[in-house]
Amino acid sequence: YTFNPSLFEKNGAKNYINHCKKILKYTKNKPVSFEVFGDSYEEMIKQANFLSSLSKNIYVKIPITYTNGQSTLKVIENLVDHNINLNITAIFTRKQVKKILPTLKDTNSIISIFAGRIYDSGVDAFIEMREMNNLIKGSSSCKSLWASSRMVYDFIHAINCNTDIITMSYDHITKMKNFKLSLKKFSLNT
């Protein structure tokens, strides 16, 4: 399960930390990613330490950049030094992956690549994901995550380019039952 401040607002929740605690009751010991919402080194470090203290199964989501476009690499380095489970999010380019891999290579961090948004830009996200997965798997013990899926078939794309994790909306997950239908049968259901 992954959660961020924009999903928090979209779902109408009132208190981010209370909502995170509520989610932890349902997820038990499964991996959960909660994102910091600060936009400075100090805020991110403070929030990451607090979020990770809520449970051992939490991966703290750190965006690859601050809102001003500057790298959060120093934040990532600090949190790796303090053994915080990390999910580096909002990745779009191979250059971004190459920049963080030396710091993350010996961790079990998650690298969240926004494949759906890459597609939205007119670039073939399958090719980009495959190349980024080659970088990740070739020089680290990190896991890759296909984020921001746009269609059910993204699940197949994620498998075919060797992605470890995919996040999908509930609507997309329920549509996966259609994978078992022949196209003829599917057309009759339309």
Residue ranges, per PLM feature:
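Active-site beta->alpha loop and helix N-cap motifs at the rims of alpha/beta catalytic domains
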Residues: 2-82, 115-118
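General "foldedness" signal
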Residues: 15, 19-22, 46-50, 72-74, ...
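Catalytic alpha/beta core domains of metabolic enzymes, predominantly
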Residues: 84-174, 180-190
